[in-house]
Regions:
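Short, structured coil/loop segments at alpha-helix boundaries
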Residues: 16-20, 60-61, 75, 95
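Short, surface-exposed loop/helix-turn segments at secondary-structure junctions
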Residues: 46, 51-66
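Divalent metal-coordination and catalytic microenvironments
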Residues: 26, 45, 75
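Short cysteine/histidine-rich zinc-coordinating motifs and their immediately flanking basic loops
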Residues: 42-51, 85-93
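Short Cys/His-centered divalent metal-binding micro-motifs
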Residues: 36-37, 67-93
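A boundary/linker detector
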Residues: 1-42, 50-51, 56, 105-122
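Helix-rich interaction surfaces within compact, conserved domain-sized segments
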Residues: 82-83, 89-118
Length: 122
């Protein structure tokens, strides 16, 4: 029998960037799109317009997600829409500053490390 080939797991270089407790906190909010009451809510990562002093390890990249402090809540429909039309078009269409919303949630996070990371960016 042939051995099944699997892709190697992508490794995140640098300090920890995944905070499941923070993502759960974000999923506890309503969809970021005004007037939307759909669910379930997903934690969506912001990739565009990150602060210039964001360390490389927290920016994400090919096969890597950005730091979990850069997440905002969206229902499944709007999360798919964000990927389909692009992050900047999605933000312009709904008149939302995704980064500002994500950082606002990160400042109120129940995870001290997330709050500390956001403070280091300002």
């Amino acid at each position: 029998m042939l051995k099944r080939r699997t892709r190697p797991k992508m490794r995140q270089d640098g300090p920890k960037c995944e905070w499941p407790r923070h993502r759960k906190f974000v999923r506890g909010h309503t969809c970021i799109v005004p007037g939307c009451a759909d669910g379930p809510i997903e934690a969506c990562h912001v990739r565009k317009g990150l602060p210039s002093n964001t360390p490389d390890f927290a920016r994400g990249g090919v096969g890597k997600k950005p730091h979990d402090c850069f997440v905002f809540p969206a229902c499944s429909k709007h999360h798919k829409s964000q990927h389909a039309i692009g992050e900047l078009s999605f933000a312009a269409l709904h008149r939302i500053n995704l980064l500002r919303e994500a950082l606002d949630l990160a400042r109120r996070s129940p995870v001290p490390e997330v709050r500390e990371f956001v403070r280091s960016l300002t």
